[in-house]
């Protein structure tokens, strides 16, 4: 009989939970819960487990914040907890809590080919470093390397590096952003809230008053071509995603590929493919030829975080991915 474990992918907005088959890595009973409706992550987990007919003794939860010890406090949510205390309370023999992009990175080796859409470059070079990043509520970043028969994720907080401009227009936008935000990190432009920040900066630099729009409204008006400032903001978002991805590729020579996750880009996929993304990715002066063969993939799997949390746990328990 197959053994199951609990896996989770917890972001600033929703908590997704599923059962992972430890034999095959497949996911079952995927459920999503609005985080604001629960006072703790443990209460979400209990609600989910009570609805399942399977008992679990192991779990891996991916969460959108730095994991530096036993105490976890989310970056974009009020939830905070002790890993060891929650493990005892839930009666689990094993509980791993990992960064959300550690999970996404661990999904890469097990993603089916149909879950990847290539955006330029050539073929993946086996056993070379991999970069993963993605815009959602925030900007997540991780790298992945192969060490013998194991995959090792190298998480970090790369979304909070300084935002780097690449044109006079972007210099002007950075000045406008700095007026509102002080220090401007990459996440301040490459995220859902970041798209709104970009729109507001574009409007202000043009001498117009920005409207109070949501990220979805900015992208919808851009795609409908009903708002020049929204459309310019979305175009710049794509370019900046390319430039940021190129920086990641340079950092570690990621000839194993660069993978884009997150819930934002798939909403305007055709626009993204036709944008200046790939040109900006390769626009590194003397190192353009170095970056040109590196493939970029958009992850179109519905739940890469859950898949990766399962892969992380299975490898930890001795499986070979």
UniProtKB/Swiss-Prot annotation:
One of its GO terms (biological process) is glycolytic process. It comes from Edwardsiella ictaluri (strain 93-146). Keywords: ATP-binding, Cytoplasm, Glycolysis, Kinase, Nucleotide-binding, Transferase. InterPro entries: ATPase_NBD, Bacterial_glucokinase, Glucokinase. Disulfide bonds: none annotated. It is an enzyme of class 2 (transferase). Its main location: cytoplasm. Belongs to the bacterial glucokinase family. It comes from the Bacteria. One of its GO terms (cellular component) is cytosol. It is found in: Cytoplasm. GO terms for molecular function: ATP binding; D-glucose binding; glucokinase activity. This is Glucokinase. Its EC number is 2.7.1.2. It catalyses: D-glucose + ATP = D-glucose 6-phosphate + ADP + H(+).
